């Protein structure tokens, strides 16, 4: 196949989006942006990116940030293991590399939370190294370009696709080439619908377009079925404060704060009262008002939430819990997006 780089780069320089991490592509900026964009759309991530950089402008600041502040800066993005790994890696970079990311692909790959794609993006965009950065967008472009029906999730197939990507990469413009492929996949060679083939700079070379098979590519492993998990939530209020409990240090939503809840069960009001009493909470005279149902989807788990709202007498928080007022809820304690329906309700109650 004819080398795609000239046409691709011409298109990219004319059509690329103006993004802050492209305008100032320092290693830290590229790293942060790539981690944020792993599970988040560009438009949704940009406000978080700007806010995060304003608070933590460099790697030493990230390394030294308090956990609650770090979680608060990430609140709303989800997948909190991303930001925990960011900080773990930042601490290693400060200890081993003087607070600057190393200009070495393998050294980047050894850092927590940095996989092959992210290491390639940092190395090529920020350091100009001729290495691949192959994400889902790039795999989709090349599956269609070569009309290749194999599973792109197969490790051997991905290695072969990566080799193809490198066959076309101009070493002196590795970063621009990698970004151009990502941009083409994001703006033109679209997933989940008809690609905009008439706008594609590679349209005359694309074998799937010629064969009429673009919509069926790339082939992927069918998604794993999510496990439905019932969750009972108790929004316990007292004197303008809500009772929060901290999740375990490991596992789903590790270390974050949440309303009192019980997973894998749907409890009646009486059963909820008994569970709260077992925590050491005095619910004397409390009226249990049903909460609206809420649903939240994790990667492989789907929470179906229900529960109760109640007000209890003034008392100390049980072990592992805190009482939090409206200001604390907004500024200090990070409630994951799984509870956004109930957080909105809480903020109307906590006057």
Predicted segments with their positions:
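Catalytic cores of DNA base-excision repair glycosylases
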Residues: 5-198, 202-211, 215, 281-282
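Intrinsically disordered, low-complexity, charged terminal extensions of DNA damage-control enzymes
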Residues: 1-18, 23, 186-351
């Amino acid at each position: 196949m004819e080398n795609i780089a000239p046409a691709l780069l011409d298109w990219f320089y004319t059509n690329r989006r103006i993004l802050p991490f492209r305008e100032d592509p320092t290693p830290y900026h590229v790293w942060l942006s790539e981690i944020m964009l792993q599970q988040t759309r560009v438009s949704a991530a940009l406000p978080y990116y700007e806010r995060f950089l304003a608070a933590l402008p460099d790697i030493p600041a990230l390394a030294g940030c308090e956990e609650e502040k770090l979680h608060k800066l990430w609140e709303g993005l989800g997948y909190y293991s991303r930001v925990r790994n960011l900080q773990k890696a930042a601490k290693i970079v400060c200890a081993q590399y003087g607070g600057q990311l190393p200009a070495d692909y393998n050294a980047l790959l050894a850092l927590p939370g940095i996989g092959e794609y992210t290491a390639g993006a940092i190395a090529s965009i920020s350091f100009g190294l001729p290495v691949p950065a192959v994400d889902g967008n790039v795999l989709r472009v090349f599956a269609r370009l070569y009309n290749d029906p194999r599973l792109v999730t197969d490790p051997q197939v991905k290695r072969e696709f990566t080799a193809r990507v490198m066959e076309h990469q101009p070493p002196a413009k590795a970063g621009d080439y990698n970004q151009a492929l990502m941009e083409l996949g994001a703006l033109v060679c679209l997933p989940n619908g008809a690609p905009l083939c008439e706008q594609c700079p590679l349209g005359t070379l694309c074998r799937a377009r010629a064969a009429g098979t673009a919509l069926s590519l790339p082939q992927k492993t069918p998604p794993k079925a999510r496990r439905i998990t019932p969750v009972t939530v108790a929004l316990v209020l007292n004197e303008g404060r809500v009772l929060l409990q901290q999740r375990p240090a490991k596992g789903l939503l590790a270390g974050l704060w949440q309303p009192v809840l019980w997973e894998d069960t749907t409890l009646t009001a009486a059963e909820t009262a008994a569970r709260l009493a077992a925590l050491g909470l005095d619910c004397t005279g409390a009226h249990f008002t049903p909460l609206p149902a809420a649903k939240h989807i994790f990667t492989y788990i789907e929470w179906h939430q229900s529960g109760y709202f109640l007000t209890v007498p003034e008392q100390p928080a049980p072990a592992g819990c805190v009482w939090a007022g409206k200001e604390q809820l907004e500024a200090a304690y990070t409630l994951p997006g799984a509870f956004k329906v109930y957080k909105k309700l809480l903020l109307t109650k906590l006057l």
